[in-house]
């Protein structure tokens, strides 16, 4: 039987430096008999030569479009918004299963071309637990940025400036500690932070960043399902300086915060980091903004407030790219056992479940989306 060919595409999302495959996992796949083609990429945190040394074949950027149909296309974030049908099996995050804006157009490209989406967000084991996720580093980066925005707001009237990725965690934390020191000098105290979803991967990452930045336990309110069971909005959020939302959303729940709950004279809340960033989802429990932010413009102000301090929202949907090397290594390591079964993915439980979900979602597409 011919070896299975994996084609790692270059990411097109602005400032996305992460990679679903790393040189380390590429070497393991090649050792197991796979052929790995890697598109050259000026953005990827790993140099092209690192993949070449691991045994991969370097191919031109965007060459996946013309790759043989049987090649499996591996990527990370969503494809560019184009209209041509997709013929391959694609392994990636597509962000089209939770009725996000434009989901029909994104999803319909696969059945229109005879292709298949195996969405990384929904790869689960037999217990329904995700086999690999960027949650920890998303929470870590989100909480780190939230601390920097809090300090910035106290000392500047203009919006928080753009940020770039860091070579490692130590460099990020050094910057955050410096910012917190400046914030404390202005506020006269350390910030109080509430993290909702604190027991999961994302929330534990957020709490880890807060502690490494010098925020003591007594200033961190770490909530999970038990604490939110009574239903919001929650005064504890507006009493905190920073709110980091780390919940994984699958259905509508009572709002954690809304415009009405923010209109209180004693509001302390200055920064919301919505790590979940389900900005356009009808399920969002943080319906106080409608704009997805970027590393170029990390915050969006909450308009319409009549009292209290300014309030900024961070809603970057690829926060782990702030720490691209560490985030990629951790994710790809966790994904590797599943990647090693791609040569028989139809009969591998993890991939078969992803295919079943794809089929279910395709069945909900309006006929008009399939006719383009």
Swiss-Prot record:
User: What metabolic or biological pathway is this protein involved in?
Assistant: Amino-acid biosynthesis; L-lysine biosynthesis via AAA pathway; L-lysine from L-alpha-aminoadipate (fungal route): step 3/3
Q: Which UniProt keywords apply?
A: Amino-acid biosynthesis, Disulfide bond, Lysine biosynthesis, NAD, Oxidoreductase
Q: Where is the active site?
A: 77, 95
What EC number(s) would the UniProt record show? 1.5.1.7
Report disulfide bridges, numbered on this chain. 202-246
Q: Name one Pfam family in it.
A: AlaDh_PNT_N
Spell out the SMART domains in the cross-references. Answer: AlaDh_PNT_C (SM01002), AlaDh_PNT_N (SM01003)
Q: Where does NAD(+) bind?
A: 129, 200-201, 224, 228, 248, 275, 316-319
MF term (GO), any? saccharopine dehydrogenase (NAD+, L-lysine-forming) activity
Q: Where does this protein hold L-saccharopine?
A: 18, 77, 100, 130, 134, 276-278
State the signal peptide span.
none
Q: Does the keyword Oxidoreductase apply?
A: yes
Write down the superkingdom of origin.
Eukaryota
Q: Which reaction does it catalyse?
A: L-saccharopine + NAD(+) + H2O = L-lysine + 2-oxoglutarate + NADH + H(+)
What cellular-component terms does GO give this entry? cytoplasm
Q: Which GO terms describe its biological process?
A: lysine biosynthetic process via aminoadipic acid; protein import into peroxisome matrix
As for what it does, the entry says:
Catalyzes the NAD(+)-dependent cleavage of saccharopine to L-lysine and 2-oxoglutarate, the final step in the alpha-aminoadipate (AAA) pathway for lysin biosynthesis.
Q: Which family does it belong to?
A: Belongs to the AlaDH/PNT family.
> What quaternary structure, including any partners, is listed in this protein's UniProt entry?
Monomer.
- Protein name in UniProt: Saccharopine dehydrogenase [NAD(+), L-lysine-forming]
Specify the species: Neurospora crassa (strain ATCC 24698 / 74-OR23-1A / CBS 708.71 / DSM 1257 / FGSC 987)
What lineage does the source organism belong to? Eukaryota, Fungi, Dikarya, Ascomycota, Pezizomycotina
């Amino acid at each position: 039987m011919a070896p299975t060919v994996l084609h790692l595409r270059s990411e097109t999302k602005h400032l996305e430096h992460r990679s679903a495959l790393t040189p380390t996992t590429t070497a393991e796949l090649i050792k197991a008999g796979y052929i790995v083609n890697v598109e050259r990429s000026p953005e990827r945190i790993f140099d092209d030569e690192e993949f070449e040394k691991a045994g991969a074949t370097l191919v031109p950027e965007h060459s996946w479009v013309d790759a043989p149909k049987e090649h499996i296309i591996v990527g990370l974030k969503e494809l560019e918004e184009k209209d041509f049908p997709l013929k391959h099996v694609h392994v990636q995050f597509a962000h089209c299963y939770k009725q996000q804006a434009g989901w029909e157009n994104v999803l319909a490209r696969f059945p229109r071309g005879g292709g298949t989406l195996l969405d990384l967000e929904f790869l689960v084991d037999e217990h329904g637990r995700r086999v690999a996720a960027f949650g920890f580093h998303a929470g870590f980066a989100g909480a780190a940025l939230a601390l920097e925005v809090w300090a910035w707001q106290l000392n500047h009237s203009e919006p928080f400036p753009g940020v770039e990725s860091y070579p490692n965690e130590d460099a990020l934390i050094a910057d955050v500690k410096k910012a917190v020191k400046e914030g404390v000098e202005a506020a006269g105290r350390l910030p109080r932070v509430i993290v909702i979803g604190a027991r999961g991967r994302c929330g534990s990452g957020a709490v880890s960043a807060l502690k490494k930045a010098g925020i003591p336990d007594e200033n961190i309110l770490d909530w999970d399902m038990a604490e939110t069971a009574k239903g919001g909005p929650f005064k504890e959020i507006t009493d905190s300086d920073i709110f980091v939302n780390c919940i994984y959303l699958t259905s509508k729940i009572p709002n954690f915060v809304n415009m009405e709950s923010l209109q209180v004279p004693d509001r302390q809340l200055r920064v919301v980091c919505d790590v979940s960033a389900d900005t356009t989802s009808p399920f969002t429990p943080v319906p106080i903004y409608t704009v997805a932010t970027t590393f170029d413009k990390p915050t969006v102000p909450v308009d319409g407030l009549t009292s209290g301090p300014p309030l900024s929202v961070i809603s970057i949907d690829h926060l782990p790219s702030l720490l691209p090397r560490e985030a990629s290594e951790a994710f790809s390591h966790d994904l590797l056992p599943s990647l090693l079964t791609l040569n028989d993915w139809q009969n591998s439980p993890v991939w078969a479940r992803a295919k079943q979900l794809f089929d279910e979602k395709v069945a909900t597409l309006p006929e008009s989306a399939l006719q383009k």
